[in-house]
């Protein structure tokens, strides 16, 4: 499937996103000797882990870490002793609570990492460093952290609408209404801008490595922000084409070349974006064992449908109830298909994806003046004239 024509049509909308002075992590950190070697960080004893993690963050950040250091007592007060009534979510990393802090006075989300979970000291360090040094409207803001004793706690800005997963894949459990088409395109465009910033503005580039619906948080106006940077990795530098690392991330979202070889590039994130975008279009989970065998893997199910434009409407989320522009659906599926190309080199850059999605995001459904059925009839009339 070709998407080049879509990008050409919208070339007049493309912005010069690559700043002449890329935001440099290297200005704050010796990238060669520090941030690229997070995998080699080790703490010789349990006491050194507990005692010196804040000093390690300060040393690596070279005084550029602005995040507030909270005491465990302060966060107990903020969350009312981590009261279950204040719990916002739970995952393999631990639990997230709503809290109220006094300095600065604001409502926050407090993520208490599970001491036996997958996110250990290394991932904790990476997340604090990344969110302290990288700033963008589509990245969640880190307010502070706590490393008292064996506690590992991250304090974020509070996002009123939770995660994209809550509104897309967990509707019944969370008693949410399905997102309309325009909101889905708005969220997709914003999340794409976050990845574009990491790939094309941060210096050196950052590979997110864990792009999924549960890591996309939404504010009260459904503006998206990427969260959970524990698995983020600094991208290749100095002429290198990829970073070799052990495979991490969530099953179903990993690019095939990364899953098979451990070779990681920014195009690995592009694939993951394609998976999530396809989830947003279809309302289906990437892996759903409740469906028939041939439909359990979202990408496998979608692949043959991508080749037949007449079947595109079969891929739209039934909860949209046909309320979407048919041309917008075709273009959105074209973007998803390009992001999901098997060969990494054939996937678009995130700046191209942003260009396409910003066009879709400003093309409001109600402005089209046609129902889906009306557009289909128009297309049928055009075909009959040929």
Curated annotation (Swiss-Prot):
According to the record, the signal peptide region is none
The answer to whether UniProt assigns keyword Transferase to this entry is yes
GO MF terms, alphabetically ordered: ATP binding; protein serine kinase activity; protein serine/threonine kinase activity
Broad class of the protein's primary localization: membrane
Cellular-component GO terms for this entry: peroxisome; plasma membrane
Tell me one Pfam family matched here: Pkinase
Family recorded in the similarity comment: Belongs to the protein kinase superfamily. Ser/Thr protein kinase family.
Does the keyword Metal-binding belong to this entry?
no
Positions of S-palmitoyl cysteine lipidation: 5
Q: Which segments constitute the Protein kinase domain?
A: 82-360
- Catalytic positions? 210 (proton acceptor)
Give the protein name, as stated in the record: Probable serine/threonine-protein kinase PBL23
Look up the EC number in the record and give it. 2.7.11.1
Q: Set out the biological process GO terms recorded for this chain's protein.
A: defense response
Q: List the disulfide bonds.
A: none
Give the reactions, separated by semicolons, that this protein catalyses.
L-seryl-[protein] + ATP = O-phospho-L-seryl-[protein] + ADP + H(+); L-threonyl-[protein] + ATP = O-phospho-L-threonyl-[protein] + ADP + H(+)
**Keywords, sorted A to Z:** ATP-binding, Cell membrane, Kinase, Lipoprotein, Membrane, Nucleotide-binding, Palmitate, Plant defense, Serine/threonine-protein kinase, Transferase
